[in-house]
């Protein structure tokens, strides 16, 4: 019956909190007419069936579960913002990520930086998020950011936050100053997830934000229309970044927190596994597997992703996304991809000496531009980022095109 099916989200919640209880699973299987044995299966069925509206008692029950874990969770769902009609995502698809609000995964706020020459804790193969804004060059090692997943900082005079979702493999650099707001947003980790993607929150309004899109989805700002500007950042090895930017600043290992910041320690098993830690519907994997890395660009209402492995045997790809011609320069070994606009008909090639070339012209690769050797022409950097394929293809609301050779 329709009324009984409204209880499905309640049983999905019970599957999580009872540890896949077989009696709850049997009830769910009967209601959904689908064999369900685990919370992962139940959650994925729920994601695929948005027509199921939860029973009126669902919200109170979910708040009880969350509140018993950490009463700070309740701040995100206060009336009237926690009502179904005020939220941009379904309450039943919001799940606990296993940590408390802003405690288990604390953000780094204006963290101490040191000179590259003094960063003796890093080894050449360590990956970093490299950032350059207005000549201010910084590196934030993934081995540290994996523990914190968020920094709030000012780079080149621009207030920014890097939100790193380890579960979906994406580190995205957002500008946090928004027109009409008195002060830049300061972000932290909520401890909640949506389809295996972190929900961050801003400390001022305590609205929940989609980490992948930079948009508020629950809370006072959900109807604001705010969408944070994305700045380019580059994943690369410390050796490559240091060679390209010897005067770079780098995040100090003295963060003020006690963590095991050793190379390759954080999330080692998850990064090596083909499986997801938390449930999310995964689409067709005939071309690319769920946890293969892609570099994605979204613009002009279109989205496109390039497998990072496509750069294993080539450095340069000329392509188009959303009607805009782009050139991508990558290195699969270090998960590095940079993208730049190019003019119509312009084709870039690798000169095998670290630069690019077009007909009769050489170009230097910088963090902000491609610059012609005579300094007369520039091609602007296009914001994009690396993530797992399952995440890129699941969070935009736009079906992504996938590059194939």
PLM regions and their residue ranges:
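Alpha-helix capping and inter-helical loop/turn segments
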Residues: 2-7, 19, 30-38
């Amino acid at each position: 019956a329709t009324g009984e099916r409204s209880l499905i989200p309640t049983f999905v919640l019970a599957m999580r909190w009872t540890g896949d209880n077989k009696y709850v699973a049997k009830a769910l299987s009967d209601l959904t007419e689908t064999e369900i044995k685990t919370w992962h299966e139940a959650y994925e069925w729920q994601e695929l069936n948005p027509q199921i509206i939860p029973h009126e008692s669902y919200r109170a029950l979910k708040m009880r579960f969350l509140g018993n874990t950490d009463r700070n969770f309740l701040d995100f769902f206060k009336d009237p913002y926690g009502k179904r009609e005020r939220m941009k995502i379904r309450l039943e698809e919001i799940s606990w990520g296993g940590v408390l609000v802003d405690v288990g995964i604390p953000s780094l706020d204006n963290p101490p930086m040191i000179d590259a020459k003094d960063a003796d804790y890093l080894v050449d193969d360590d990956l970093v998020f490299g950032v350059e804004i207005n000549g201010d060059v910084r590196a934030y090692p993934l081995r540290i950011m994996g523990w914190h997943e968020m920094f709030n900082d000012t780079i080149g005079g621009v207030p920014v936050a890097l939100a790193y979702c380890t579960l979906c493999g994406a580190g995205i650099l957002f500008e946090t100053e928004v027109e009409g707001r008195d002060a830049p947003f300061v972000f932290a980790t909520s401890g909640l997830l949506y389809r295996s993607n972190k929900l961050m929150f801003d400390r001022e309004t305590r609205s929940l934000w989609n980490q992948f899109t930079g948009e508020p989805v629950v809370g006072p700002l959900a109807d604001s229309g705010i969408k944070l500007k994305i700045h380019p950042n580059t994943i690369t090895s410390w050796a490559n970044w240091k060679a390209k930017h010897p005067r770079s600043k780098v995040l100090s290992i003295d963060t003020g927190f006690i963590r095991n910041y050793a190379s390759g320690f954080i999330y080692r098993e998850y990064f090596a596994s083909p499986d997801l830690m938390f449930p999310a519907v995964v689409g067709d994997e005939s071309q690319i597997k769920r946890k293969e890395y892609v570099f994605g660009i979204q613009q002009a209402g279109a989205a496109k992703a390039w497998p990072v492995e496509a750069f294993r045997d080539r450095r340069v790809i000329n392509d188009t996304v959303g009607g805009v011609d782009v050139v991508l320069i990558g290195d699969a070994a270090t998960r590095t991809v940079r993208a730049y606009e190019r003019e119509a008909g312009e084709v870039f090639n690798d000169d095998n000496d670290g630069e690019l070339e077009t007909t009769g012209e050489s170009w230097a690769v910088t963090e902000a531009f491609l610059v012609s050797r005579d300094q007369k022409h520039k091609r602007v950097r296009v914001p994009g980022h690396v993530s797992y394929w399952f995440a890129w293809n699941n969070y935009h609301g736009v079906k992504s095109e996938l590059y194939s050779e």
